[in-house]
Amino acid sequence: MDCPKRKQTRLPEFDYSSNGAYFVTFCTQDRRCILSDVDVGEGLAPPAVCLSAIGQCVEQEIHAVTKRYESVRIDNYVIMPNHVHLIASICEQTGGASPSPTLADIIRVIKSVSSHRCPELKWQRSYYEHVIRSERDYLEIWNYIDGNPGKWADDKYYIEA
């Protein structure tokens, strides 16, 4: 029996350990809303993301990955009910023999350690990534991440509870 081939989502011949910024989205399995709740607020109050215990675990691992890999920064992120958006930057190594991690290494660590710590957390296979190629692109993505909670009901990952 022939298995369907997965669509290749990565850029061929691109070095995902090279210096640069990357926009990444990864989802919970079956898009289960277990990471947070979004309170859209009333009147002029800004929306607030209230992390669940599982979401707090994911947030801890987002911060921990920058300690594990000195060349990695997480510039901005938001933990939505069933997915995470983040900007990961890989910077030049400042010595040492170990190579820079790839983007896949970074996301693998966040997903595997958080699901190990919270066994009820299961992640969807793979992730979406976009190579950020300009300051304008970077700022648009930054604003998208910051504005995402306010647009939760219109989000393509939205599932009504």
Q: Where do the model's predicted regions map?
A:
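Short catalytic/metal-binding and nucleic-acid-binding patches
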Residues: 1-161
